[in-house]
Amino acid sequence: MSLATLDATQHPNLPASAATLFKAKAQKKLSFEQIAQHIGRNEVATAALFYGQAKASPEDIQKLSELLNISPQVLEEQLSGFPDRGRSVEMPPKEPLIYRLYEIVQNYGYAYKAVLNEKFGDGIMSAISFSTKVEKETDADGNNWAVITLRGKW
């Protein structure tokens, strides 16, 4: 199994907690799916904690401490503040997969907006009251497809 790791030189804007969490994740050889199951979040929400893009609850801190063998005091110090969202990626992104996600919004953003406005009226989809997940589908020809679900309160 391939595991996501962190090259801190590629991500200079991440908080100190990112290096702490990714180092322990690599040492324990745990996937985000395994960590998510332990703390009771989905994989993407768990990864967002690692990248400093989500706020950790006291329960998250305790469970991460137990699973990753990191002092709860260290995690409390590093994770108890408010996340500084959106600063970890330069714009436009250079990493190819992240650029493709950016490109989706560039190409389909106004189409999404038009359809959402027709279905819901004037407003916006929340990125705070929000959940997302990633699933893998394999078609009849054996091709793998990524399915990304975005669910936000209107």
Curated annotation (Swiss-Prot):
Its EC number is 4.2.1.104. Keywords: Lyase. GO terms for biological process: cyanate metabolic process. The keyword Ribosomal protein does not apply. The keyword Glycosyltransferase does not apply. InterPro entries: Cro/C1-type_HTH, Cyanase, Cyanate_lyase_C, Cyanate_lyase_C_sf, Lambda_DNA-bd_dom_sf. It catalyses: cyanate + hydrogencarbonate + 3 H(+) = NH4(+) + 2 CO2. GO terms for molecular function: cyanate hydratase activity; DNA binding. The active site is at R100, E103, S126. Pfam families: Cyanate_lyase. HAMAP family: Cyanate_hydrat. Catalyzes the reaction of cyanate with bicarbonate to produce ammonia and carbon dioxide. Belongs to the cyanase family. This is Cyanate hydratase. It comes from Aspergillus fumigatus (strain CBS 144.89 / FGSC A1163 / CEA10). The lineage of its organism: Eukaryota, Fungi, Dikarya, Ascomycota, Pezizomycotina.
